[in-house]
Amino acid sequence: MQFTLGMYGEGDFFSMKGVVEEFFEKIGMHKKETYDPNAGKTFLHPGRQANIIYDGKVVGYLGEVHPEVADTYGIGTRAYVAVIDMPEVVELATFDRKYEGIAKYPAVTRDISMVVPKEILVGQIEEVIEKKGGAYLESYKLFDLYEGAQIKAGFKSVAYSIVFRAKDKTLEEADVSAAMKKILGALEEMGIELRQ
């Protein structure tokens, strides 16, 4: 049994990805999912599709409907779909409900934009953010992924928003800078260039 989501109009690939991540969070799948861009679905745009991987298992896929398919069905705008394999997801879900109070201290957000070799997956970048982000790392979100004429051949542009927060104090610039230095250093070691 599959659960299928669709959107068109104002949404984009990242909007659909956000919907999937929110769905997983609501059913107690709290580990970070990763995305493999080699979903191989012919009805999806070849450069805008990915398998959804959770806890090492492919649990679905998402992407932009191929323009030719959209034209065939009279869809005059970009359309996006996510298909989730419910038997796999039900095995992984905990359906737990936890109350979290309102955060007492403010968050600090840093955005990073990178030029990344095409063979490096966003999941590898996210592993670095998680490992090097330190105790104050609260969350991160991919907000831009671009391959095109303005980016040199063999590379893609990737951008993340990274959020830091302490539970017991207001973070100082030095706290955030130290974490960002570790993240950026590890990314540069992978051959990733930071965009200014």
Task: Give the residues covered by each predicted segment.
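A carboxyl-terminal module marker
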Residues: M1-T4, E10-Q196
